[in-house]
Amino acid sequence: METFTGYLKSTCFHQISPYPPSIMSIQVKVHANILILSFIECLRMPMHRQIRYSLKNNTITYFNESDVDWSSAIDYQCPDCLIGKSTKHRHIKGSRLKYQNSYEPFQYLHTDIFGPVHNLPKSAPSYFISFTDETTKLRWVYPLHDRREDSILDVFTTILAFIKNQFQASVLVIQMDRGSEYTNRTLHKFLEKNGITPCYTTTADSRAHGVAERLNRTLLDDCRTQLQCSGLPNHLWFSAIEFSTIVRNSLASPKSKKSARQHAGLAGLDISTLLPFGQPVIVNDHNPNSKIHPRGIPGYALHPSRNSYGYIIYLPSLKKTVDTTNYVILQGKESRLDQFNYDALTFDEDLNRLTASYHSFIASNEIQESNDLNIESDHDFQSDIELHPEQPRNVLSKAVSPTDSTPPSTHTEDSKRVSKTNIRAPREVDPNISESNILPSKKRSSTPQISNIESTGSGGMHKLNVPLLAPMSQSNTHESSHASKSKDFRHSDSYSENETNHTNVPISSTGGTNNKTVPQISDQETEKRIIHRSPSIDASPPENNSSHNIVPIKTPTTVSEQNTEESIIADLPLPDLPPESPTEFPDPFKELPPINSHQTNSSLGGIGDSNAYTTINSKKRSLEDNETEIKVSRDTWNTKNMRSLEPPRSKKRIHLIAAVKAVKSIKPIRTTLRYDEAITYNKDIKEKEKYIEAYHKEVNQLLKMNTWDTDKYYDRKEIDPKRVINSMFIFNKKRDGTHKARFVARGDIQHPDTYDTGMQSNTVHHYALMTSLSLALDNNYYITQLDISSAYLYADIKEELYIRPPPHLGMNDKLIRLKKSLYGLKQSGANWYETIKSYLIKQCGMEEVRGWSCVFKNSQVTICLFVDDMILFSKDLNANKKIITTLKKQYDTKIINLGESDNEIQYDILGLEIKYQRGKYMKLGMEKSLTEKLPKLNVPLNPKGKKLRAPGQPGLYIDQDELEIDEDEYKEKVHEMQKLIGLASYVGYKFRFDLLYYINTLAQHILFPSRQVLDMTYELIQFMWDTRDKQLIWHKNKPTEPDNKLVAISDASYGNQPYYKSQIGNIYLLNGKVIGGKSTKASLTCTSTTEAEIHAISESVPLLNNLSYLIQELNKKPIIKGLLTDSRSTISIIKSTNEEKFRNRFFGTKAMRLRDEVSGNNLYVYYIETKKNIADVMTKPLPIKTFKLLTNKWIH
C-alpha cells in the first residue's frame, strides 16, 4: 500500500504539474482522473465505477470516497484502453429515419447477394440477389447462377426498368456492401450513366447494411423451414425464397400497421390464390403420349407465377417445374415426396392395342368453369365440344348414360375393369383419389343442344339460352373453385344430392363472353366439391331440351328495385319494337355471308363492326335490316391477318416526320378580318362604313372603361421588350348581321413571365348547361339571357404590361400602359372570372356549385356563366329581374331575352338555337348556323340530290396503305380535315350525339388525309347538311314524378378498332331527356365483350356522380341514378359478391369500383335489350333502319 500511495503521489504531482495553482487543493482532495490513471499504471484497469464502489465499501483503504473528485471521471479517456479494447460502434436507434423522410418511395434501395449454395444441379440457381425499398419496405428477389458482372448488371437493369414503368419512379440511391460484384467498373459506369448514387458500406461494417442482411437471413430461415415442412428437394430452395418474399410483402408491419404492398399502393394479397408451399396437386397433362394414357401428373405447388396468372408447380416424375392453371388440389395430410411411387406410374403395353372409338371427355360445363375461374387453359376445349354427339359405342357408354339411376359413386363392372388395367396404383395414395374421381359419374349433365342464340354483336356479349344442367333429380355436377383451393386442406367426403339446393343464377367471368345458367352453391358445399372436379363426358341430350324448360337469366331483385327499374326505363326515349314471331335456329353454315378478298385493316378506324355482321342470324343487327348497298360483312382484321395473334403492323407514311412538324405549323381557321382588310383596302363601301362605325364604337368603349393610362406615353426603347404586347383590331360579322370590331392583344406571343400560369379561365360546362335547361323545362322555370358588354375590361390587371396605341392615333413609336384586362391576354379570362365571381357572391347573394365552375345558385335563381353571357333560371321571373338590377349597377348588362312570354320563345344560347315553351317542350338545334357555315367549307354538297339517310355505311373500311402525296398537298388536306372535323365535333358535342361515333373515328385520321378518309368526311358533312333541320326534342316530365332520374346507357363494340381496341359509348339522360353523349376508343385493350362493357360503364360512372351532385344542388328533389347495359355478364359481375381474383388487374379494379358504386351510392344497374340500346349509335355504324329506330324518338 505504501508503494501504491507513493506511486500515486508521484503520479499526481506529475499529472498536475502544468497547473501550479491546484497543487495545494489536490493535497486535500484527489482528482478522480489521477486516481484512475494510477490504477491504470499499476493494475492496467481503469474501471472508475469499481474503484468508487471499492472505496465506498472499504475494500481499498487509505482513501475514502469523499477524498476523490468524481465529476470528470465519466469523460476521462485512456488512449491505451481505447487501443486495447477498441470495438465497433453501437447501432444508433432510429438512424435511418432521415432516409425515410428524405426520399420518396422507390428512390432509396438496399441490395445484397447471398450464396453460393453448394451441391445443386446446374439448372438450379446458386445465388440470389435481394432488393428492399427504404420507404415502402417492398422486397424483390432474383435468382443468380453466378456473380459475374454481366449477371449482376442484367438484374440491375431489370429492377430499375420495373420500378420506372410500374411505379413511375426513378431510383436515386442504392446502398450495398463493398463486394466486388458491386464495386466493379461495369456496374459503377452503369449507375453513373443512370444518375444513381451508389452508397457503399464502410470497411468491415456489415451492421450498416442491416436492412439487406436481415432480409436475407429472414428469407433463409423461411426457406429452411419450408423445405423441411414440405419435404421437397434442396434444389427448389429459391422457390421457397420467392414464396417467402410474396408472403412477407403482404404481411402488415406492427410498427406501421400496413404491409409493404399497401405502402407501395398495390392491392393486398388474395389469399385464395396462394397455396401452401409444397401443397400436393394433380396437374393436367395437355400433351399425353396417347389418348388412353392418364391425364393427371402428381406435383407440388411452389409459388404464384411472375409471368402469368398460373402457378409454378414441381413435377417430380418429369423432374421439372411448369407454369399452369390446370391443376386440382389434393386434400390430405401427407405432403412428402414418398407419398407417391413414381416408378410405379407405368402403363400397360397391352392398352396400346385397344382401338375403341374415342369421344370427347370435355363437357361444356368444364369450359364454363374455366371461364369462371378466370384462367386460361392449355387445352383448346372448344375443339372437343360436339353440339350433336353420337351415342358412345365403347365400353364407357353405359357408365355415362344420363338416364341411369345408379348413384354417382358406383360404376359398372366394365368401367372398373378398364380402370384397373389403365394404371398401376401408387404405393400410398390419398383416399380421395379413386375411380369415382378419375372416371365421370353416371349422372352427368350432357352437352346441351343449342336451342336459341341471341348475339349482341360487338356491342355486348353472346347470350346462350342453354340449360347447362339437367333437371334437379337427374344431375349432379362436380365443380371446383380456384378461389377455394387454399381454404380447406382436410379430407372431405363426397356430397349427396339431397345436400344441395340449386338455384339458377348468372355466373360470368371478366374474360368470357358467354352468360349461362349454372347452379348457385353454398360455401360449405363448395368446399366439399373442391376435390371432385373431373371432366364430364358428352352424352345424348335430354329428351326435354326445349326453350320451355329454360330458366330465364335474371338477378333476384326486391319489389322496390323492380319498381325503380320500371320507373327509370318508363321515361326513356327507347324505340318501340314490334313483337317478333319465334324463329328456329338455322344451320350454322347455311347463311354465312361472302368474304371480300379486298378487306382492309380497319373500318373507318372502326366503322364497320367486327362482330355485328359475322354472327349468324344476329338478332341484334340482322343483315336483312340493312338498306344500304353493303353486300359484304367483314371482321376488323382480314383473314390473312388473323393467322397471327399480333395485330398488323402500321405501314409507314411518306414524309411522316415532316408531316407532323407541318401540322404544328398549320394555322387555325380564321373567320375574322384585319384592319387593312376591313377598312383600308375594303372595296365594299357600305361594309367599310359599317366597320368604321364599329371601330370608333370600340375605341370609345376602351376609353370609357379606362383601359390604359392616357396621361403618359412611353418610349419604346425604355421598356423591357418582354412586357410589350402586340395588339391589333379584328373585325367580323355576327350571325344577327351586326358588324363588330374588337381591339385585342396578341396573347399567342405573350412572354410567360408576364402572367400567372396557375390562373384558370373557367366557363360553364356544356353538361351543366344542358342539365340546367332540362330542369328548367321540368320545373316551369323562366329562362333569361343576358350579355355583359366588354366584360374583360371590367377586370383590373396586376402585371406591368404595355401595348401600342390604336392605329388612328398615329403613334407607332410610343407605348401605353394597360390598366384593364384587354381581350387576348393570357390572364384576361381568369381576371374576369374572379371579378364576376366575387360580385355574384358578395353583391347578388349567389354561391358557386362545388365542382362545377361558373354555375351559381341561391334559393331562387340559377346562373350559368359563359364569359360575358349569362343564362338565368328561376321559378319567379321577379327573382331574375332582381339579379339583373344588381348587375346593372356595376356592369353594362344587356337583356337579350327576358323569357316572360308563355308562348314559344326562341333563344340563341352558346350556339344552340333553342325553342322553349314553358311547361311543354324544348327543342335544341343549329339549323340557321349550319345553313350558313356548311356551304363555306368548300365541300361538294348536293342540295338537290337524294338525301343520305345514315351518316356512314357499315362495312366501309379505311385502307391504311401508304399515303403517296407531297408536302404541300399533305398540309392542305390536313388543314381541310381540321376544318371539317372541327365543325362536326362542335355540332356533335352540342346536340348531335348520334354522329359522335363517326366524328370520333374520322378525327383519328386527321393526320392521314387519304382520298378515302376525305370522301367519308364529305359524306358525314353531306349528312349533316341533309339533316341540318334535326332537333334534340325534350318534353316536360310528368308533374307527379317525385324524383329526378339520372340514367347512363352504356355500350361497347369489342375489338372493332385497329390493334384490337374497342369503341365505347355512353348516353346520359335526365328525366328521359338526352343531355349528353360520348364516344371514344377504349384506352385499354379488352380481351372480351364483357371487359369492353365493364370499361364503358366505368367511364360513365364519374360523370354520372358529378351530374348527380349538380342536380341535387340545383333541385332539391331526390335523385335516382341508373346504369343500363345490354351485357348480362357485366351486370352479373357488378352485382356479384364473389371476391375471386380477376384475370386482369386493370378490369378487376374497374369491376370492384363499380361494385362499390352500386352498393354504396344507390346506383341501380339494369339490363336493356340490345335492340333498344340507343347507345349502340355511339359504338358502331348501323344500318339505316336500325339507326333510325334508335334515334327517331329523341332527335328528329
Curated annotation (Swiss-Prot):
CDD domains: RNase_HI_RT_Ty1 (cd09272). Residues 779-917 form the Reverse transcriptase Ty1/copia-type domain. It comes from the Eukaryota. Residues 1051-1193 form the RNase H Ty1/copia-type domain. Its EC number is 2.7.7.49, 2.7.7.7, 3.1.26.4. Mg(2+) 3 binds at D1051, E1093, D1126. InterPro entries: DNA/RNA_pol_sf, Integrase_cat-core, Retrotran_Ty1/copia-like, RNaseH-like_sf, RNaseH_sf, RVT_2. GO terms for cellular component: cytoplasm; nucleus. Keywords: Cytoplasm, DNA integration, DNA recombination, DNA-binding, DNA-directed DNA polymerase, Endonuclease, Hydrolase, Magnesium, Metal-binding, Multifunctional enzyme, Nuclease, Nucleotidyltransferase, Nucleus, RNA-binding, RNA-directed DNA polymerase, Transferase, Transposable element, Transposition. Mg(2+) 1 binds at D112, D177. Residues 446-456, 495-523, 542-552 have a biased composition (Polar residues). Residues 479-494 have a biased composition (Basic and acidic residues). The record marks A658, A659 as: Cleavage. Initially, virus-like particles (VLPs) are composed of the structural unprocessed proteins Gag and Gag-Pol, and also contain the host initiator methionine tRNA (tRNA(i)-Met) which serves as a primer for minus-strand DNA synthesis, and a dimer of genomic Ty RNA. Processing of the polyproteins occurs within the particle and proceeds by an ordered pathway, called maturation. First, the protease (PR) is released by autocatalytic cleavage of the Gag-Pol polyprotein yielding capsid protein p45 and a Pol-p154 precursor protein. A motif (Bipartite nuclear localization signal) lies at residues 619-653. Residues 101-276 form the Integrase catalytic domain. GO terms for molecular function: DNA binding; DNA-directed DNA polymerase activity; metal ion binding; RNA binding; RNA-directed DNA polymerase activity; RNA-DNA hybrid ribonuclease activity. It catalyses: DNA(n) + a 2'-deoxyribonucleoside 5'-triphosphate = DNA(n+1) + diphosphate; Endonucleolytic cleavage to 5'-phosphomonoester. It is found in: Cytoplasm; Nucleus. Pfam families: rve, RVT_2. The C-terminal RNA-binding region of CA is sufficient for all its nucleocapsid-like chaperone activities. PANTHER family: TRANSPOSASE, PUTATIVE-RELATED (PTHR42648), TRANSPOSON TY4-P GAG-POL POLYPROTEIN (PTHR42648:SF11). Reverse transcriptase/ribonuclease H (RT) is a multifunctional enzyme that catalyzes the conversion of the retro-elements RNA genome into dsDNA within the VLP. The enzyme displays a DNA polymerase activity that can copy either DNA or RNA templates, and a ribonuclease H (RNase H) activity that cleaves the RNA strand of RNA-DNA heteroduplexes during plus-strand synthesis and hydrolyzes RNA primers. The conversion leads to a linear dsDNA copy of the retrotransposon that includes long terminal repeats (LTRs) at both ends. Retrotransposons are mobile genetic entities that are able to replicate via an RNA intermediate and a reverse transcription step. In contrast to retroviruses, retrotransposons are non-infectious, lack an envelope and remain intracellular. Ty1 retrotransposons belong to the copia elements (pseudoviridae). This is Truncated transposon Ty1-A Gag-Pol polyprotein. It comes from Saccharomyces cerevisiae (strain ATCC 204508 / S288c).
